Amino acid sequence: MAGGFLSMANPAVTLSGVAGNIISFLVFLAPVATFLQVYKKKSTGGYSSVPYVVALFSSVLWIFYALVKTNSRPLLTINAFGCGVEAAYIVLYLVYAPRRARLRTLAFFLLLDVAAFALIVVTTLYLVPKPHQVKFLGSVCLAFSMAVFVAPLSIIFKVIKTKSVEFMPIGLSVCLTLSAVAWFCYGLFTKDPYVMYPNVGGFFFSCVQMGLYFWYRKPRNTAVLPTTSDSMSPISAAAAATQRVIELPAGTHAFTILSVSPIPILGVHKVEVVAAEQAADGVAAAAAADKELLQNKPEVIEITAAV
């Protein structure tokens, strides 16, 4: 069986399929830490449901493709797992999200995961001739994969503009690179261009992210405390704040895409406003400290000796 999951007739297909499943399995579980926080706090905070709704759509789309094509068991297994995981994330989000966010999530879910997917299924099965169904559906999957590649561009531009890699975790980029390589090999060995081509883009963007990370990565700096001396004026607390590393909670990296190739997934992210607010809070705190320091500035007492 050419595309079988454990086909020994083509060990290369087996190895690439297994590797792709293992790496994608880990990527699907990446948001677990985020949702543990949501569960403990009983609140979604500033987290968005968009990545999980899009990831669910991606998984069901690739499952449908694997069923129409047949002999694509690696795609079936990992995307079936992905469907379950993403559905669990969405349910948990709906439980703890505020009413407005819950309604937006439900509307987006019905529009993308129900209406859009139903339209694709009906079109494929009833309007496209059977000999062309794989080509049509593969083209839809390919177009969707390329469309979501717009997401990494935003984070790449942000890193270049700010010269900061706070929003781009290196571990995720490494996993995505390995995943893209594994799924590219699977598409190559099974002669499936619809699996192979998206991974070229996934590999490229992952390598760019890793390159930017090492280019702009800076060693962790320690905050400089305001001090005084005989020959120096008090160091500005605001200036010291510029050397301080602002710790961001887990999940605050902005809209990073997980191009786990035949399964483009949008990664965990938190609204960037949250990070901006934290930075603003840090500056405000530094300004307050500066003001307090100036108010408590030690007086210089001149002692004149009588001659």
Curated annotation (Swiss-Prot):
GO terms for molecular function: sucrose transmembrane transporter activity; sugar transmembrane transporter activity. Induction: By the X.oryzae pv. oryzae (Xoo) transcription activator-like effector (TALe) protein pthXo1 and, possibly, AvrXa7. Residues 17-100, 136-219 form the MtN3/slv domain. Residues 36-47, 96-107, 157-168, 216-307 are cytoplasmic. Mostly expressed in panicles and anthers. Also detected in leaves (leaf collar, leaf auricle, leaf ligule), roots, sheaths, culms and culm nodes. Disruption phenotype: Reduced starch content in pollen and male sterility. Enhanced resistance against bacterial blight mediated by X.oryzae pv. oryzae (Xoo) strain PXO99(A). Keywords: Cell membrane, Membrane, Plant defense, Repeat, Sugar transport, Transmembrane, Transmembrane helix, Transport. One of its GO terms (cellular component) is plasma membrane. It is a multi-pass membrane protein. Its main location: membrane. It is found in: Cell membrane. The chain crosses the membrane at residues 15-35, 48-68, 75-95, 108-128, 136-156, 169-189, 195-215. Residues 1-14, 69-74, 129-135, 190-194 are extracellular. It comes from the Eukaryota. GO terms for biological process: carbohydrate transport; copper ion transport; defense response; sucrose transport. Mediates both low-affinity uptake and efflux of sugar across the plasma membrane. Required for pollen viability. Involved in the transport of copper, in cooperation with COPT1 and COPT2. Confers sensitivity to bacterial blight mediated by X.oryzae pv. oryzae (Xoo) in its Xa13 allelic form (e.g. cv. IR24), probably by providing the sugar required for the pathogen growth, or by reducing copper contents in xylem. However, a recessive resistance can be associated with the xa13 allele (in which the promoter is mutated leading to reduced induction upon pathogen infection, e.g. cv. IRBB13), specifically toward Xoo Philippine race 6 and Indian race PXO8. Belongs to the SWEET sugar transporter family. Interacts with COPT1 and COPT2. Interacts with APX8. This is Bidirectional sugar transporter SWEET11. The gene is SWEET11.
